Amino acid sequence: MARNVQCIKLGCEAEGLDFPPYPGELGKRIFENVSREAWGQWIKHQTMLVNEMRLSMADIKARKYLATQMEAYFFGEGAEQPVGYVPPEK
């Protein structure tokens, strides 16, 4: 049976993650407060950041940058957008 969480990103109760997606306290906070749907949205945003900013996951600075962006995305003012990003029209 799926567990539900009060998702901090979506602002509603939704299906939670099966396990902490990131190590440490940040992973625990995400597991307890972020839904599966919101995590999927972050993965898409993270992929865009990696591709547009040409980040190398072998670079410790890039990994720290993404961790900072992930925390801002869920618990802060929101993650940065790549320079020149224009959101798709709805």
From Swiss-Prot:
Disulfide topology: none
Keyword Iron: yes
GO biological process: cellular response to oxidative stress
Gene Ontology molecular function, alphabetical: iron ion binding
Keywords: Iron
Gene Ontology terms: cellular component: cytosol
Record-linked InterPro entries: Fe_traffick_prot_YggX (IPR007457), Fe_traffick_prot_YggX_sf (IPR036766)
Family: Belongs to the Fe(2+)-trafficking protein family.
HAMAP family from the UniProt entry: Fe_traffic_YggX (MF_00686)
Function in brief: Could be a mediator in iron transactions between iron acquisition and iron-requiring processes, such as synthesis and/or repair of Fe-S clusters in biosynthetic enzymes.
Protein name: Probable Fe(2+)-trafficking protein
Organism name: Nitrosomonas eutropha (strain DSM 101675 / C91 / Nm57)
